[in-house]
């Protein structure tokens, strides 16, 4: 048996042992998640490695496609906790719900700027065409943010057009109808293999955005505080496992994303697990404010609402203040 398989088997054994020690008296808890993307990995790893059972929770993960449907299931009581896009929670709360963000799973946008081979730095984009998925999307927002960061005026210095999906944008790059676009990890690996350049990483430009969050309701916090507390303890333990057990974590990524290309799996692990997943998963108030600013034109309620309205970080703060998170990394 090769070393990677030994490490993976060891990790699975750890999960079994952890689970065996924690099942007695475990509380049942359904947890929803809204997408099959690399940003969702911490939840899957926490489940697969047995940390919910260690913390006396018998968790069933439920995939509910799309942020709005997942948030609706949360509000209906079908799933008391969800991992979902932050914007879905914000819009739901603005509409009068009691949904609240209790942790930040991914606090920026997972986009990199990909260009045709002859463009090697952002200033060369002046007068060129950038393709986005659709106007008003997070992809479009990220493209405009990047251009402004590099001193280029979107639409004026750099025309922006709608193209559609990532495959469509790659085809447009290859065909020369656009000169740049934004793609997510691990599609960045494919971009490099096709000979395109990656000249900027949004996550390294300091942008805070509540891309993916752990959310519940105020009612659940009031009626099941210990379940939420144990969930959060398991979750930060899962993040630690994610960051420190590469082979086992890659196996979970490959399983849930149904990926056979281990080079792409490693790209996702390094770029998201190691670089972008926070050890201390506090929600980002700046990131929530950015969501509010983004939707203010279509929802005037967003203008006068403070980001603190949407966040309750007490459970992460308890763990942080107790030193429990820091001890994991010693």
Question: Which residues does each PLM region occupy?
Answer:
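N-terminal secretory signal peptides that target proteins for export/translocation
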Residues: 1-6
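Bacterial N-terminal signal peptides
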Residues: 9-21
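Sec/Tat signal peptide C-region and signal peptidase I cleavage site
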Residues: 22-26
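Short, glycine-/small- and polar/acidic-enriched structural segments
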Residues: 27-175, 179-185, 198-208
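Short linear loop/turn motifs
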Residues: 60-61, 158-161, 267-273, 306-317
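Pocket-lining segment of extracytoplasmic ligand-binding domains
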Residues: 87-88, 167-259
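Secondary-structure end/capping motifs
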Residues: 222-304
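Conserved C-terminal helix/tail region of periplasmic/extracytoplasmic solute-binding proteins
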Residues: 296-330
């Amino acid at each position: 048996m090769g070393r990677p398989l030994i490490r993976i088997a060891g990790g699975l054994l750890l999960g079994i042992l952890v689970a065996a020690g924690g099942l007695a008296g475990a509380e049942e808890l359904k947890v929803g998640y809204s997408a099959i993307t690399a940003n969702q990995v911490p939840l899957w790893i926490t489940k697969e490695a047995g940390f919910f059972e260690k913390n006396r929770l018998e968790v069933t993960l439920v995939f509910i496609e799309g942020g709005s449907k997942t948030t609706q299931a949360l509000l209906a009581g079908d799933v008391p906790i969800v991992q979902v896009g932050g914007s879905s929670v914000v819009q739901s709360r603005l509409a009068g719900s009691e949904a609240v963000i209790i942790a930040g799973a991914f606090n920026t946008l997972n986009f990199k700027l990909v260009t045709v081979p002859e463009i090697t730095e952002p200033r060369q984009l002046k007068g060129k065409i950038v393709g986005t998925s659709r106007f008003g999307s997070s992809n479009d927002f990220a493209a405009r943010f990047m251009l402004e960061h590099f001193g280029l005026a979107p639409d004026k210095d750099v025309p922006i057009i709608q193209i559609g999906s990532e495959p469509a944008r790659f085809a447009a790059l290859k065909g020369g109808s656009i000169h740049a676009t934004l793609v997510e990890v691990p599609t960045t690996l494919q971009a490099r293999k096709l000979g395109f350049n990656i000249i900027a990483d949004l996550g390294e430009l300091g942008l805070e955005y509540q891309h993916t969050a752990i959310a519940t309701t105020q009612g659940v916090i009031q009626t099941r505080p210990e379940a939420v507390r144990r969930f959060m303890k398991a979750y930060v333990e899962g993040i630690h496992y994610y960051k420190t057990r590469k082979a086992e974590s890659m196996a979970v990524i490959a399983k849930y994303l149904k990926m056979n290309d281990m080079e792409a799996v490693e790209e996702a692990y390094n770029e998201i697990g190691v670089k972008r997943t926070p050890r201390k998963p506090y929600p980002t108030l700046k990131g929530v404010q950015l969501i509010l600013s983004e939707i203010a034109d279509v929802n005037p309620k967003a203008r006068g609402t403070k980001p603190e309205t949407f966040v309750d970080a007490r459970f992460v703060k308890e763990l942080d203040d107790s030193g429990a998170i820091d001890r994991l990394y010693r």
